[in-house]
C-alpha cells in the first residue's frame, strides 16, 4: 500500500512551519548552572568515518565500546541525527559554524588527489597545492570565538582539517590551545600524510612525538588541557582520526591500531577479516581514550557540570558497519549522512534515553551558545537551533527538512521523505518504513518528488544569494 500523497498546500505549510520553528527556537531555554553561575564545561568528541552500527549501544555485536555505551546510558542516544556532508572537511566546518557548507563556503574538501594514484609530492610542489593553501573563509565566526564572551578557554586536540596556512589555523580562529594535524588524514605513527609531516603544536609544525600512536597523543593533550583549565569553563574539542584509514601510499590502505588491541580480537581468517579487525581495534582504542577523558571529569568533580557530545563526522567507510542503512561515506544515501550520536548533560537531559527526533550537527552550535549564556554572532545566519528541549523530551524537533549537495550529487529529506539524485543511485524513499532506502517510490509518488526537487531548487538559490564565502565561490 503506497503512502498517502500530501497536498501542495500541506507540503508548503510543513516547510513554513519548519522555518518558523527554527527561528523561534533560537531563543531557547535557559541552561542549568552550578551554584555560583559557572557555565557548563563542554567536551565535544568526533570520530572519523565510524559506521552507524560501530557501537555496542547502536546494535553492533562484534565491536567493544564500553565507554561510549556507558556515555549513552548516562545521557541520550540520537538515532535520527545527520551531518551536513558525507565526508570530513565540510562536516567539521558546519559543526564549528552552525551553518550549511554552502553558506559558510567550505562545501568541498581541501585535499590533493594525486596521492590516490601513488604520487608523492616534493616539498616545493606540495607548498602550492590546494591541500596546503585552501582554508575556511576567515570571516566565518567559529564556536570558540563566541564562547570567549563567557570566559571559556578552548582547545582542539586531533584533526583540524580547515586549512594549513597560519591564518587558517585554530589559534587564529578562536582556540587557545592546539595539538593535532592540519589535513584530512595521516599515518597514525609517523604523523605524515603521504610522506608529508602534518602535526602541529599551536602555530608551529612539530615532530616531537613521531612514532607514538595518535589516539594516545590526543588523549594525553586533552587530559592536560582539562587539568589546566579545571577552575574555569572550557571547550575541549577532540576530533580523533580513528577509525579513518591511514594516509599512506601503500594499497589497500590500513586502519592502524596498536597490536595489543588487534590481538584482543579473534584471529582473522582472511584479508577482509583482518581489515575489519584493524577497524574494530582502532575504535576500541579510541573508546578507551574516551573513557580516560570521562574518568578525569569524574576525578575533577566536573562531570555534573559538563556537556559531552559525541558523533561521527560522516558515515562509515571501508569495513565499517553501517547497517541497516544503505551506502557509506561519500554517498548521499543514509549510510553516508546519518551517524551515531549521543549527548550527556546532567540536569538538563535525562539519562538512559533514546531520541528518535530529526536532528543535525548544525543544532550543536546554537545549543552550546545557549548553554554558555552567550548570544550567537551578530548578523550571522545560523541553520540550526538549540536542540536541548528536544533531547530532554520536552518538545518535538522543529526540523522538518535537510538538504545536501556534493558536486553533482544531491539529496533532500523533508519530513520522512528522502530524495537522492547521485552517481551511486537515485530515488525517492519513505524513511518511516524504509530506512534502508530499498524501495524507490518515484513512480508511485511523482508529485512528492516534484515538490522536493522544487524545494531543493529554492534552497540552492537561497545558498547562492547568501553573502559569498571562499574558497570556492566566485565573487
Describe the residue ranges of each PLM region.
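His/Cys-centered metal/cofactor-coordination and adjacent catalytic loops
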Residues: 104-143, 201
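Anion (oxyanion) recognition and catalysis
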Residues: 72, 148
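Short, surface-exposed beta-strand/loop micro-motifs that present aromatic residues
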Residues: 144, 225, 408-420
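C-terminal segment of N-terminal export signals and the immediately downstream linker at the start
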Residues: 25-44
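Residue-level detector of anion-binding/catalytic polar loops
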Residues: 77, 153, 418
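Active-site-proximal cap/lid insertion segments
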Residues: 36-40, 47-63, 70, 79, ...
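N-terminal secretory signal peptides and thylakoid transit peptides that target proteins
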Residues: 2-19
Amino acid at each position: 500500500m503506497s503512502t498517502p500523497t500530501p497536498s501542495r498546500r500541506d507540503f508548503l505549510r510543513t516547510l513554513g512551519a519548519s522555518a518558523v520553528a527554527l527561528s523561534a527556537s533560537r531563543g531557547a531555554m535557559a541552561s542549568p548552572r552550578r551554584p555560583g553561575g559557572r557555565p557548563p564545561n563542554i567536551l565535544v568528541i568526533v570520530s572519523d568515518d565510524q559506521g552507524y552500527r560501530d557501537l555496542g549501544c547502536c546494535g553492533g555485536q562484534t565491536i567493544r565500546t564500553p565507554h561510549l555505551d556507558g556515555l549513552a546510558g548516562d545521557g541520550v542516544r540520537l538515532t535520527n541525527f545527520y551531518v551536513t556532508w558525507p565526508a570530513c572537511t565540510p562536516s567539521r566546518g558546519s559543526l564549528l559554524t552552525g551553518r550549511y557548507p554552502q553558506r559558510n563556503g567550505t562545501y568541498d574538501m581541501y585535499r590533493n588527489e594525486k596521492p590516490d594514484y601513488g604520487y608523492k609530492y616534493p616539498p616545493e610542489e606540495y607548498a602550492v597545492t590546494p591541500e596546503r593553501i585552501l582554508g575556511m573563509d576567515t570571516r566565518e565566526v567559529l564556536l570558540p570565538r563566541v564562547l570567549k564572551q563567557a570566559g571559556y578557554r578552548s582547545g582542539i586536540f586531533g584533526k583540524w582539517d580547515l586549512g594549513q596556512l597560519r591564518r587558517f589555523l585554530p589559534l587564529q580562529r578562536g582556540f587557545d590551545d592546539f595539538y593535532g594535524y592540519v589535513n584530512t588524514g595521516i599515518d597514525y605513527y609517523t604523523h605524515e600524510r603521504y610522506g608529508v609531516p602534518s602535526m602541529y603544536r599551536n602555530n608551529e609544525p612539530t615532530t616531537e612525538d613521531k612514532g607514538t600512536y595518535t589516539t594516545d597523543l590526543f588523549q594525553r593533550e586533552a587530559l592536560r588541557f582539562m587539568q589546566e583549565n579545571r577552575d574555569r569553563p572550557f571547550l575541549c574539542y577532540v576530533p580523533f582520526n580513528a577509525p579513518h584509514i591511514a594516509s599512506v601510499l601503500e594499497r589497500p590502505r590500513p586502519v592502524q591500531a596498536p597490536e595489543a588491541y588487534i590481538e584482543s580480537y579473534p584471529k582473522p581468517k582472511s584479508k577482509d577479516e583482518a581489515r575489519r579487525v584493524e577497524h574494530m581495534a582502532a575504535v576500541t582504542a579510541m573508546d578507551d581514550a574516551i573513557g580516560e577523558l570521562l574518568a578525569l571529569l569524574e576525578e575533577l568533580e566536573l562531570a555534573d557540570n559538563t556537556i559531552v557530545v559525541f558523533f561521527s563526522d560522516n558515515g562509515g567507510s571501508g569495513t565499517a558497519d553501517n547497517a541497516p542503512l544503505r551506502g557509506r561515506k561519500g554517498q548521499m544515501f543514509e549510510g553516508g549522512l546519518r551517524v551515531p550520536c549521543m549527548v550527556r548533560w546532567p540536569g538538563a537531559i535525562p539519562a538512559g534515553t533514546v531520541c528518535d527526533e530529526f536532528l543535525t550537527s548544525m543544532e550543536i552550535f546554537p545549543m552550546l551558545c545557549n548553554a554558555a549564556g552567550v548570544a550567537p554572532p551578530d548578523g550571522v545566519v545560523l541553520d540550526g537551533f538549540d536542540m536541548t528541549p528536544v533531547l530532554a523530551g520536552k518538545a518535538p524537533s522543529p526540523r522538518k527538512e535537510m538538504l545536501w549537495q556534493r558536486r553533482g550529487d544531491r539529496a533532500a529529506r523533508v519530513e520522512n521523505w528522502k530524495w537522492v539524485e547521485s552517481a551511486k543511485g537515485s530515488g525517492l524513499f519513505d524513511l518511516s518504513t524504509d530506512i534502508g532506502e530499498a524501495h524507490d517510490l518515484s513512480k508511485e509518488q511523482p508529485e512528492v518528488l516534484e515538490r522536493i526537487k522544487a524545494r531543493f531548487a529554492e534552497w540552492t538559490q537561497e545558498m547562492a544569494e547568501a553573502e559569498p564565502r571562499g574558497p570556492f565561490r566566485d565573487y
